[in-house]
Amino acid sequence: MKKAVILFNLGGPDSLNAVRPFLFNLFYDRRIINLPNPFRFLLAKFISAKRENTARKIYEEIGGKSPILENTKMQANALELKLNENRNHVHKVFICMRYWRPFADEVIESVKQFDPDEVILLPLYPQYSTTTTLSSIENWQKNAKRYGLKCNTKMIHRYYDNQDFIEAHTNLIAKYYKLARKIGKPRVLFSAHSLPLSIIKKGDPYASQVERSVELIVEKLAINNLDWSICYQSKIGPVKWLEPSTESELLRAKADGVPVVLSPISFVSEHSETLVELDIEYKAIIKDGYYFRVPTLSTDPLFIKCLADLCINLP
């Protein structure tokens, strides 16, 4: 049997000229801004124009483009190798980005050429949110219908509590905790992408799933009297978002004089929100030598095993 696995991710601009259209695509998503047209269109135009210069400066810090596609390609290659250890099926992994290339329509054409017996949709978002997982799945389904991809399709919605996912995080955090312990008693900050409270109040389970991921990791770490906190980053605009912010928790740690081990709990690949926000902007808050940023899971063998098992064990 031939199986196509579609890895969903956010996407990112591949040049500075792509920054504004990328931002427009992001804010035009009705799962991000729930307004009817033409209001959503006009607001997306306004926000993308207003934020372009700020965003361009962020991408200039990391070579003028987002590394998310290259990082996702490494994950896709590792996953395809792992899946094809099972010789009963032939797996091919495709990457589909939500707000920049490769878009769903391009990917669907490639999938049609592969002609699979089954399609598996696998978002690179461990914790489910309507703004990420659901948005990607809905967009895929709409384009699959439009471009005539008729195939048995299965979906993976979440894996925030998967044993291998938890263990992969635990191992990385333990390594950096040990380094930080040489300075003092560390505080572990689990930083997740924030969401507006209005979305959470509508029943989005994202925050509760982030909390459960962290609970399981803390339990697995089994460190006596572990000092830890969940915090949220990447807030924009004046509305109320999930709190506390990562910045405020770093300022608290600075005031307390403790080393910080920061784990990007909701991110599985490196991009602007880790490489700039965490590694440059937030790092500057903490005293030199007191900041230990845990890398994203990327191609960690346990994480790749987690993804492969999710695909293989689908009913």
From Swiss-Prot:
Its EC number is 4.98.1.1. The keyword Nucleotide-binding does not apply. Keywords: Cytoplasm, Heme biosynthesis, Iron, Lyase, Metal-binding, Porphyrin biosynthesis. It comes from the Bacteria. Pathway: Porphyrin-containing compound metabolism; protoheme biosynthesis; protoheme from protoporphyrin-IX: step 1/1. GO terms for cellular component: cytoplasm. It catalyses: heme b + 2 H(+) = protoporphyrin IX + Fe(2+). It holds the Pfam family Ferrochelatase. Transmembrane segments: none annotated. Signal peptide: none annotated. Fe cation binds at residues 193, 273. Its main location: cytoplasm. It is found in: Cytoplasm. Belongs to the ferrochelatase family. Catalyzes the ferrous insertion into protoporphyrin IX. This is Ferrochelatase. It comes from Wolbachia sp. subsp. Drosophila simulans (strain wRi).
